[in-house]
């Protein structure tokens, strides 16, 4: 007997399993993972979004909650699973899973705990999506991007850390607040380590091509009576402040990740400060991942922009690299 569906639908194509062409997987459905997921969904970047986590009840609940909002989205399929087979065929895999940073805890203190988690995550991702781009968000992001590269066996241009994309966004927001100009028209870069030893490029700050350093030579120095140096301190402190106030950060990093995902999925070739292998750049001799301005496309990182840094900025970058290497060299994975 014909079902209601049979009475309603006349079949034209032969029955076949639908294929996903722009699939994105988010690993970890904590506050950051779900902020990434909803930000990606709101930008209509994928025809399928998969969620993966070890907490099955929460995972199913988050999936159902998003599915129930499907009418308001343009992503055809939202799935979830504890098994990484659900992630198969992903173009982009966003990793947010890991131990959460506690109040007052530096990102680098998280390292070994999260390395142990990555040992289980990375091989399964590569097994099911061997051609994917991996975007690492878990902290400490620079070290864990290095770990993901080592564990995955993928070429380095397909392993990206979210890095200083958010630091730079915070920097530009605070810059705009001071100047009364929207952050999209304020240009400034934060490079190096995501977090405590990040490097603000004072020499590159501009609005409409007008160099702030030329207008105000003391910019970013201890001699600056306007204390613009506090801008970078506020960037570094901001995550700790948000964690102190609400227990974790989520929305800004979620929006930052969706920004990166958009550039990758749409092959936009935009420049972002993301974490990549920096060996042989700016006198750095070790295998460390730090943020530099990178051109992103649908293959991952296609190019690195060679910023002209002042000697003190270059020294800070080298110091940042040394800080990370001192931790990396003792990792067990």
Swiss-Prot record:
Q: What top-tier enzyme class does this entry carry?
A: oxidoreductase
SUPFAM superfamilies in UniProt = LDH C-terminal domain-like, NAD(P)-binding Rossmann-fold domains
Ligand binding (NAD(+)): 30-58, 100, 139
Q: Where are the transmembrane segments?
A: none
- Which residues does the entry assign to the active site, renumbered to this chain? 194
Matching entries from Pfam families are given as: Ldh_1_C, Ldh_1_N
**Residues recorded with modification N-acetylalanine:** 2
Its UniProt pathway annotation is: Fermentation; pyruvate fermentation to lactate; (S)-lactate from pyruvate: step 1/1
Which EC numbers characterise this protein's activity in its record?
A: 1.1.1.27
Q: Which GO terms describe its biological process?
A: lactate metabolic process
UniProt catalytic activity: (S)-lactate + NAD(+) = pyruvate + NADH + H(+)
Q: Which residues bind substrate?
A: 107, 139, 170, 249
Keywords tagged on the record: Acetylation, Cytoplasm, NAD, Oxidoreductase
- Cellular component per GO? cytoplasm
InterPro entries per record: L-lactate/malate_DH (IPR001557), L-lactate_DH (IPR011304), L-lactate_DH_AS (IPR018177), Lactate/malate_DH_C (IPR022383), Lactate/malate_DH_N (IPR001236), Lactate_DH/Glyco_Ohase_4_C (IPR015955), NAD(P)-bd_dom_sf (IPR036291)
GO terms (molecular function) for this protein are: L-lactate dehydrogenase activity
Principal place of residence: cytoplasm
Q: Which Gene3D superfamilies match?
A: Lactate dehydrogenase/glycoside hydrolase, family 4, C-terminal (3.90.110.10), NAD(P)-binding Rossmann-like Domain (3.40.50.720)
Give the record's subunit note: Homotetramer.
Q: Which family does it belong to?
A: Belongs to the LDH/MDH superfamily. LDH family.
This chain belongs to which protein, by name?
A: L-lactate dehydrogenase A chain
Species per Swiss-Prot/TrEMBL record: Squalus acanthias
Task: List the gene name.
Answer: ldha
């Amino acid at each position: 007997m014909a079902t209601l569906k049979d009475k309603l639908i006349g079949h034209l194509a032969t029955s076949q399993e639908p294929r996903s062409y722009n699939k994105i997987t988010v690993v970890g459905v904590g506050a950051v993972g779900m902020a990434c997921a909803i930000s990606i969904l709101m930008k209509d970047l994928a025809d399928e979004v998969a969620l993966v986590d070890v907490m099955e009840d929460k995972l199913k609940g988050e999936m159902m909650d998003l599915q129930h909002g499907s009418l308001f989205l343009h992503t055809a399929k939202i799935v979830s699973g504890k098994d990484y087979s659900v992630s198969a065929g992903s173009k982009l895999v966003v990793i947010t899973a890991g131990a959460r940073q506690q109040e007052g805890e530096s990102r680098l203190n998280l390292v070994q705990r999260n390395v142990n988690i990555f040992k289980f995550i990375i091989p399964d991702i590569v097994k099911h999506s061997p051609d994917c781009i991996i975007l690492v968000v878990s902290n400490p992001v620079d070290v864990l991007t290095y770990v993901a590269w080592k564990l995955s066996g993928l070429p380095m241009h397909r392993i990206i850390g979210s890095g200083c994309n958010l630091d730079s966004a915070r920097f530009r927001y605070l810059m705009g607040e001071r100047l009364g100009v929207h952050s999209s028209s304020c240009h400034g870069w934060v490079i190096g380590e995501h977090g405590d030893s990040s490097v603000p490029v004072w020499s590159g700050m501009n609005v409409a091509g007008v160099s702030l350093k030329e207008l105000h030579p003391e910019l970013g120095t201890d001699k600056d009576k306007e204390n613009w140096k506090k801008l970078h301190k506020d960037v570094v402190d901001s995550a700790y402040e948000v964690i102190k106030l609400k227990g974790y950060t989520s929305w800004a990093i979620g929006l930052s990740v969706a920004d990166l995902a958009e550039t990758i999925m749409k092959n936009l070739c935009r420049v972002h400060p993301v974490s990549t292998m920096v060996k042989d750049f700016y006198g750095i001799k070790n295998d460390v991942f730090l943020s530099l301005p990178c051109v992103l496309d649908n293959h991952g990182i296609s190019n690195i922009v060679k910023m002209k840094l002042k000697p003190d900025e270059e020294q800070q970058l080298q110091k940042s690299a040394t800080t990370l290497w001192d931790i990396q060299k003792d990792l067990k994975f």
